[in-house]
Each structure stands twice: as structure tokens, then as C-alpha cells.
């Protein structure tokens, strides 16, 4: 169980609760909980446009991928069959489908064991990236290399933007907020 915000104030910290008498694997439970939280938080932030492809987000791109997987030329026939059966197992729930892919992403793909198809991997990697240490380890694998190079390029552009912002703040003798420095480190 989780709570992404308290009431109408969106700046409150989230809460996640787990049963005291946990019978399942705690890692799997927390991974599932985090996946559900990411999905719902994205929906909360996007508001009514959570599945509108004109505003790229985790939920919009993932819903688009699931809705139009039959027309996607990047997927093989076998991958399309797997998506169809996975959707039946998830009872046609985009959220449940994402959570299952997220668990696979964290548990297997993070250990260089590819299980997801290319399209799902790119979407999840874009919005749910691994830490720097795991990304560096995955960079050796050719399956992840191109995707991670694009991610690194995108992040270097953001870092450049943050550097420019820090320079402007230094020139005006304003203290740089800790959040900006933390974003730069990530």
C-alpha cells in the first residue's frame, strides 16, 4: 500500500507501507510497490492527460506501446504473441502490465539478463533509469549500449543546461540550491 501525496498538497513526501507479517520476498514486494508508485505518481502529475502521447511521459508512451503493439514494426511476431498473453494475464490492465515489466526490468535487466522486448526496454529505461554504477556495468553489453548512449547524450544536455544555470546563479551571487546540485550528480 502507498500514498503518493497527502490531500491536495503535492509537495508532501510519499508513504509506503508493508505488512509486519511479510510472507513473500521483501525485495519483490518493494519492487512491485515502487512500480505501482511510479505509475500512479506519473498519472497524478500528468492529470487528465496521463495517456496523451502529445505529452511524452511514462504512462502515455507505455499505453501507446500496449495499445498499438500489433502495428509496431520493431516487434517480432513472437514478441507480439507474448504481449498478447501478458495482457490477458494482467486482465487488460496497463498498470499491471507496466508493473510486471518494471519488476522484470529491476530484477533481471539490472543484472544483464535481458527479458523485455526492445520497445518496452527503451520506454522503461527512459523513465526509470538505473543508477550510474549499474548503467556503467550494462554499457559493456551491446544490447544495452545504444540505448544507454542515447540516455547519456540526453543527460549530458541536461547537465549542460544545469551548468549554465549554476553559472548564472554564481554571477548574480545567489546560492545554488542543493536540489540542483543533486540533480547534476545523478
Enumerate the language-model features and the residues they cover:
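Active-site-flanking segments in enzyme catalytic domains
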Residues: 1-186
Amino acid at each position: 500500500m502507498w500514498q503518493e501525496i497527502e490531500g491536495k498538497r503535492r509537495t508532501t513526501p510519499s508513504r509506503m507501507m508493508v505488512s509486519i507479517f511479510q510472507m513473500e520476498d521483501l525485495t519483490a514486494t518493494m519492487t512491485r510497490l515502487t512500480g505501482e508508485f511510479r505509475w500512479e505518481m506519473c498519472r497524478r502529475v500528468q492529470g487528465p492527460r496521463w495517456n496523451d502521447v502529445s505529452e511524452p511521459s511514462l504512462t502515455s508512451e507505455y499505453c501507446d506501446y500496449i495499445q498499438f503493439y500489433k502495428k509496431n514494426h520493431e516487434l517480432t511476431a513472437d514478441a507480439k504473441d507474448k504481449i498478447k498473453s501478458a495482457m490477458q494475464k494482467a486482465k487488460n490492465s496497463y498498470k499491471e502490465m507496466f508493473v510486471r515489466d518494471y519488476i522484470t526490468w529491476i530484477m533481471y535487466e539490472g543484472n544483464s539478463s535481458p527479458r523485455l522486448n526492445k520497445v518496452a526496454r527503451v520506454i522503461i529505461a527512459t523513465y526509470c533509469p538505473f543508477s550510474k554504477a549499474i548503467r556503467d556495468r550494462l554499457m559493456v553489453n551491446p544490447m544495452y549500449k545504444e540505448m544507454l548512449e542515447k540516455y547519456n547524450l540526453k543527460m549530458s544536455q541536461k547537465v549542460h543546461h544545469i551548468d549554465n544555470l549554476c553559472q548564472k546563479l554564481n554571477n548574480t551571487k545567489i546560492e545554488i540550491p542543493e536540489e540542483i546540485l543533486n540533480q547534476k550528480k545523478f
